[in-house]
Curated annotation (Swiss-Prot):
Signal peptide: none annotated. This is Large ribosomal subunit protein uL2. One of the primary rRNA binding proteins. Required for association of the 30S and 50S subunits to form the 70S ribosome, for tRNA binding and peptide bond formation. It has been suggested to have peptidyltransferase activity; this is somewhat controversial. Makes several contacts with the 16S rRNA in the 70S ribosome. One of its GO terms (molecular function) is structural constituent of ribosome. Keywords: Ribonucleoprotein, Ribosomal protein, RNA-binding, rRNA-binding. Residues 1-23, 222-242 are annotated as: Disordered.
Length: 274
């Protein structure tokens, strides 16, 4: 992927960069693999805001992605690399030999015409999905399952890759992109390779309108609000927040206060991120 930079014809263009989309080979998605979902604008089923700063944006259709990779021992040919407006990674359209079509996350070195397969007997090459027990130590992987058969939930964004560090008994040790070292059951599957669109992290938004197209609304400072909307609100003009430390909109300590809840699976984390 290459980054396209514009001439500074306006303040928004000056710091504006986009993907060249040179790896995209098909402009229209596969109709049978599309699902329409109503934009909820960050609201739950009661209409209350559960995620702030969401709303608007361009209409999109959901591409049904095969995160489970449960079509075992059936070869599939890569027919196209496509853009997906709902994620940062590119997706690949796979034609299986039995006639079925599916979308998968596209690894960086996947090309049209490549043959991929899922299963314990698959070769550990880019795009193939195998149990962690069948993947050589040191291999870069993505789309990692935490519970066997439920589909990959970790390492799915553009340019991401985890590394299989070791295997011991029923567990494999995986280093995640955040630096966290975590044990995962060795019968859980993962896909070999690094996810494509590697330079996505270097893109510059450039202007507020582009974020609105992506469905992101403005973020207002708490000190600019009234006191009934935020702990930092109120006062005359540029007043200090009036407390010893910053607070969230719900009155909890912000910036450095640990909010991660304890989970049963925390015992599988060998080393925290950072």
């Amino acid at each position: 992927m290459a980054i396209k930079i514009y001439r500074p014809t306006s303040p928004g263009r000056r710091h504006h960069s986009v993907s060249s989309f040179e790896e995209i080979t098909k402009s229209r998605p596969e109709k049978a693999l599309l699902v329409s979902v109503k934009n909820d604008s960050g609201r739950n089923n009661q209409g209350r805001v559960t995620v702030r700063h969401r709303g608007g944006g361009s209409k999109t259709q959901i591409r049904v992605i095969d995160f489970k990779r449960n079509k075992l021992d059936v070869p599939g040919r890569i027919a196209a690399i496509e853009y997906d407006p709902n994620r940062t990674a590119r997706i690949a359209l796979v034609f299986y030999t039995d006639g079925e079509k599916r979308y998968i996350l596209a690894p960086s070195d996947l090309k049209i015409g490549d043959v991929i397969m899922a299963g314990e007997n698959a070769e550990p090459k880019s795009g193939n999905a195998l149990p962690l027990s069948a993947i050589p130590t040191g291999t870069f992987i993505h789309n990692i399952e935490l519970i066997k058969g439920r589909g990959g939930i970790m390492v799915r964004s553009a340019g991401a890759a985890a590394q299989l560090m070791a295997k011991e008994g029923d567990y494999a040790l995986v280093r995640l992109p955040s630096g966290e070292m975590r044990k995962v059951r060795s019968d859980c599957s993962a896909t070999v390779g690094q996810i494509g669109n590697i330079e996505h992290g270097t893109l510059e938004i450039g202007k507020a309108g582009r974020n609105r197209h992506l469905g992101w609304r403005p973020t207002v400072r708490g000190s600019a609000m009234s006191p009934n909307n935020h702990p930092h609100g109120g006062g005359e003009c540029r007043s200090p927040i009036g407390m010893t430390g910053p607070k969230t909109p719900w009155g909890k300590p912000a910036l450095g206060y640990r909010t991660r809840k304890a989970k049963y699976s925390d015992k599988l984390i060998v080393k925290r991120r950072g």
